[in-house]
Curated annotation (Swiss-Prot):
Naturally occurring in which organism (per UniProt): Arabidopsis thaliana (Mouse-ear cress)
Domain of life: Eukaryota
Similarity-based family: Belongs to the heat shock protein 70 (TC 1.A.33) family. HSP110/SSE subfamily.
Protein name: Heat shock 70 kDa protein 15
Positions with biased composition (Low complexity): 787-800
Region (Disordered): 502-579, 784-831
GO biological process, one term: protein folding
Length: 831
């Protein structure tokens, strides 16, 4: 089972994996930890990640970036409209009111949903993890911003499905940071709570989280955020400053040119980093636009002055986080700052003034989220044993249910009024389940919605659930228990609806028990009837309280000690009440979410595009192989291969290589994989024999020496007078001598043939044949010359009467064999 954490950032992504020795942030194919979150569509294939970033300057209109700003949001969203203005690619409104991204792919304009593009990026990250783990990756944990709505969270899950992933948890990025911070702390207090503020200033947003730590656990006390306050906003301030300056000085409008805008934004990002450590930063760009070189300079004070509108917004999420947590500045013990946008000195100055203490940077600002995601995945995985550490997460929004109800049936002349109740208040633990009781006579609907939309740029209504049809056996208003779940991903859904009906069953009880039971049933029935008589028809409670306790099916609690019932004549048949539970059909409508069929189609399209990418990569590899072979062989023919090919063959081969090189850059520039494979095989038919002759000349001497050593060794052993060979019969030794003579004669004959041949001729003596001859000689001679000495026969002791003692027959053999072992292996005996 894979344990992988993905930090899907607005600008860059990171992949962390859990191994037995800890958490590692793995490298991509370019040996970088950070992978750009860019998908570039080309005429023949897609370029994703680092390859996509490299293609952006040449193909800006088809390079899709900042996908997190688009996913799960309506096209009419004001924030989305502001973001679109700075994006070089085309985004339009789809038929469902959500954005569609347009790009030129395989020679035609195609439309993609943001979910599809995110799935492409996740598929690339999955490949990075699989390459490092050498195993398939399915289970994972993905970090998401705390401000993601229900629809955005569902969109991330759909994107993961498209990529072939199964997220065990969509964890808030600030929670992942807190987990990565706290799980390794060994000095956390056992009783008192250590309050730490985590401030994540990313590429496009600012998130604040206040967490309380105790030994072995963390509790999220509050979340706050600003969706549009990040590092890119400072880049945009610099971009607008220099764009206006260049418009006055050089009479060029950079904002009207996509490539020029990309180059200036990239330069402004570097400028921001320079200003974080220096009081002044110069800017120089050659041929920015209209063949004009531009230059400029900016001081840190000037940069901070033009950034005042952004800096003024920093305190709002800080104040809200403290307010929601019910803490003061003095209650916060430490402040941790992470994120790529946290390096602006003015930001740190504001944080220091607000908290009254210097923010700390004890964590890796870029990697902490991915590490926290991998740790959470390891905690959820059964294959990893992780230090005991509990994470108590809280939900950043308030969720309510709305329905038409509490009125009598239509025949009674009643009217239905819209009612609602908050089921999951802000700060509710994740996950959580609540149960509600409804009294209905027919099918009805429940709306899941946000209670407070002030912090949201999203429609209040999340989904609608239709419950029914159902039929009450008594023809009265039925009692239904509806279970609502806030799952681990922060997604709210109506999980089930159950029809509860009371039935009377006859059971044998004594007279005294019958009277007592009747009294209890009457009390219970009156209690059950109470909710129906009120104005409200809903009772909300934790789901764990809704299940009947053991032994209460008949409405009577089961006693701990059951007295033995004696059979008497006073037994009677008395009615008992039992609750019958029936599941009621439930249908779901999530506003803006992809349907199951649409997700399946997206999975198929992703498979087709991935196959096209793989074919093109293999084609490029084969083309590069042909090109590499041409250059390599041409150099070797003029150097070390020169003596191993005739002059006429070399000239013809060189001409053929030149012809193939010209073909590669002309007619063969855009061919299929099979054509390149055939072209390489054609060249190798001429080049391989030359290469073989060269390698044979290098290897032949060493293998001949090995065979000669083998012949001499066995021949000397066969004619030796050494006592250790005395037990070998002369006939056997003669066989060894004959084999040695035969091998030596074969080698002499082949060497004479080889010496008469020029280097460019086909070798008569191959190194492989010499190796085979040496192996055959060794295989024949070794068993003979290493035959062990026979065991010495010791005299058996004579028993009384001249008979040998039976028990002593096998005893002398052991020391004899041990002696033989010591003789043949003196090294072993000395250890």
């Amino acid at each position: 089972m894979s344990v992988v954490g993905f930090d899907f950032g607005n600008e860059n992504c990171l992949v962390a994996v859990a191994r037995q020795r800890g958490i590692d942030v793995v490298l991509n194919d370019e040996s970088n930890r950070e992978t750009p979150a860019i998908v570039c569509f080309g005429d023949k294939q897609r370029f994703i990640g680092t390859a996509g970033a490299a293609s952006t300057m040449m193909n800006p209109k088809n390079s899709i970036s900042q996908i997190k700003r688009l996913i799960g949001r309506q096209f009419s969203d004001p924030e989305l409209q502001r973001d679109i203005k700075s994006l070089p690619f085309s985004v339009t409104e789809g038929p469902d009111g959500y954005p569609l991204i347009h790009a030129n792919y395989l020679g035609e304009i195609r439309a993609f949903t943001p979910t599809q593009v995110m799935g492409m990026m996740l598929s690339n990250l999955k490949g990075i993890a699989e390459k490092n783990l050498n195993t398939a990756v399915v289970d994972c944990c993905i970090g998401i911003p705390v401000y993601f709505t229900d629809l955005q969270r569902r969109a991330v899950l759909d994107a993961a499905t498209i990529a072939g992933l199964h997220p065990l948890h969509l964890i808030h990025e600030t929670t992942a940071t807190a987990l990565a911070y706290g799980i390794y702390k060994t000095d956390l207090p056992e009783n008192d709570q250590l309050n730490v503020a985590f401030i994540d200033i990313g590429h496009a947003s600012m998130q604040v989280c206040i967490a309380g730590f105790k030994k072995g656990q963390l509790k999220i006390l509050s979340h706050a955020f600003d969706r549009s306050l990040g590092g890119r906003d400072f880049d945009e301030v610099l971009f607008n400053h220099f764009a206006a300056k260049f418009k006055d000085e050089y009479k060029i409008d950079v904002s009207q040119n996509a490539k020029a805008s990309l180059r200036l934004r990239a330069t402004c990002e570097k400028l921001k980093k320079v200003l974080s450590a220096n009081p002044m930063a110069p800017l120089n760009i050659e041929c920015l636009m209209a063949e004009k070189d531009v230059r400029g300079v900016i001081k840190r004070e000037e940069f901070e002055e033009i950034s005042i509108p952004i800096l003024e917004r920093v305190k709002r999420p800080l104040e809200k986080a403290l307010s929601d947590a019910g803490l003061t500045v003095e209650d916060v013990h430490m402040v941790e700052v992470v994120g790529s946008g946290s390096r602006v000195p003015a930001m740190i100055k504001i944080l220091t003034e607000f908290f009254g203490k210097e923010p700390r940077r004890t964590m890796n600002a870029s990697e902490c989220v991915s590490r926290g995601c991998a740790l959470q995945c390891a905690i959820l995985s059964p294959t990893f044993k992780v230090r005991e550490f509990q994470v108590h997460e809280s939900f950043p929004f308030s969720i309510s249910l709305a329905w038409k109800g509490a009125a009598t049936d239509a025949q009674n002349g009643g009217t239905e009024n819209q009612q609602s109740t908050i089921v999951f208040p802000k700060g509710n633990p994740i996950p959580s389940v609540k149960a509600l009781t409804f009294y209905r006579s027919g099918t009805f609907s429940i709306d899941v919605q946000y209670s407070d939309v002030n912090d949201l740029q999203a429609p209040p209504k999340i989904s609608t659930y239709t419950i029914g049809p159902f039929q009450s056996s008594k023809g009265e208003r039925a009692k239904l228990k509806v279970k609502v779940r806030l799952n681990l991903h922060g997604i709210v859904s109506v999980e089930s609806a159950t029809l509860l009906e009371e039935e009377e069953v006859e059971v044998s009880v004594t007279k005294d028990q019958s009277e007592e039971t009747a009294k209890m049933d009457t009390d219970k029935a009156s209690a059950e009837a109470a909710p129906a008589s009120g104005d409200s028809d809903v009772n909300m409670q934790d789901a764990k309280d809704t299940s009947d306790a053991t032994g209460t099916d008949n409405g009577v609690p089961e006693s701990a000690e059951k007295p033995v019932q004696m059979e008497t004549d006073s037994k009677a048949e008395a009615p008992k009440k039992k609750v019958k539970k029936t599941n009621v059909p439930l249908s779901e409508l999530v506003y803006g979410a992809l349907k199951t069929v649409e997700v399946e189609k997206a999975v198929e399209k992703e498979f087709e595009m991935a196959l096209q990418d793989r074919v093109m990569e293999e084609t490029k590899d084969r083309k590069n192989a042909v090109e590499s072979y041409v250059y390599d062989m041409r150099n070797k023919l003029s150097d070390k291969y020169q003596e191993y090919i005739t002059d006429s063959e070399r000239e013809a081969f060189l001409a053929n290589l030149q012809e193939v090189e010209d073909w590669l850059y002309e007619d063969g520039e855009d061919e299929t994989k099979g054509v390149y494979v055939a072209k390489l095989e054609e060249l190798k038919k001429v080049g391989d024999p030359v290469e073989v002759r060269y390698k044979e000349s290098l290897e032949r001497g060493s293998v001949i020496d090995q065979l000669g050593y083998c012949i001499n060794s066995y021949r000397e052993a066969a004619v030796s007078n050494d006592p250790k060979f005395d037990h070998i019969e002369l006939a056997e030794k003669q066989k060894v001598l004959n084999e040695c003579v035969e091998a030596e004669a074969w080698l002499r004959e082949k060497q004479q043939q080889q010496d008469t041949l020029p280097k460019y001729a086909t070798p008569a003596l191959l190194s492989a044949d010499v190796k085979s001859k040496a192996e055959a000689l060794d295989k024949f001679c070794r068993p003979i010359m290493t035959k062990p000495k026979p065991a010495a026969k010791a005299e058996a002791p004579q028993a009384k009467g001249g008979e040998q003692a039976d028990e002593g027959k096998s005893e002398p053999e052991q020391p004899a064999s041990a002696e033989a072992m010591e003789t043949e292996n003196p090294a072993e005996g000395s250890t």
